[in-house]
Amino acid sequence: MLDVDLHSHSTHSDGILLPAVLARRAFEQGVKLFALTDHDELSGLAEAREVCESLGVRFVSGVEISVTWGEETLHIVGLNINPQHPSIAAGLGLIRKGRGERAKRIAEQLDKAGIEGTLAGAQRYASNPQLVSRAHFARFLVERGHAKNTQAVFKRYLIAGKPGFVEHQWASLAQAVNWIDEAGGVSVIAHPGRYQLSPTLRERLLAEFCDLGGTAIEVVTGSHTVDQYAIWGRHAKRFGLKASAGSDFHGPQESYLDIGRLPNLPEGLIPVWNSF
């Protein structure tokens, strides 16, 4: 079992737990190296760092940046960043503004599908008013009885081809990697097994990521199967990329894995945490 977890979310994006509570949970689960990586948001880092330092947990400042690559939405995790760097702060500010606009359009789409009041409902679940996400809509729809859990809401209403799906232009891959680099961090392709990419597009993505100076692939993560650990480990080796590991924890009952419950990386991979 790894004592490292480099992907998690708090109430400052779409997680359920406050940064301080999340950090304490990491400690209680035996994590010794922990990163908070809220979606497009840095405001929870100071609180999480303070608790980690008080408990003897090494803290890594992180973020998960939303990216549009071709027709796919990707997530790029930045680790060991300087949260005060003006470049990444300004870039994330633009993304958050876009999130607000997207939330309004999602609500309009759901209203057309006969589900009213979803924007106000989602906002009630969002502790950060600048970051109303699909997860907040999903929690409200579960409350209203439209599905048993948030995963079912996504499949029924919020993914491509469903009533509440809204296309959106996020940051480019180059922008995300550049912001992370300028902030002194390392960039990681998050949960690559989740993306619907053909083999050709997968190769193109990895090559482009390397050309831009990308550092690592998240090989071990909550949504990956054991087979995917091996598959993405091989890709990391082939492209000379390091390997990261993170639960992608959002909260109890909403995550594939709890914090601190990650298996070891496949043999022969270079851990990204060797970089900081």
Regions found by a protein language model. Name each.
Residues M1-E72, Y157-A160, A171-W179, A183-G184, ...:
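An N-terminally biased module of ancient metal coordination in phosphate/nucleic-acid-related enzymes
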Residues V51-C210, P263, E267-L269:
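Extended substrate/RNA-proximal surfaces in nucleic-acid metabolism proteins
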Residues L257-D258:
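C-terminal regions of proteins
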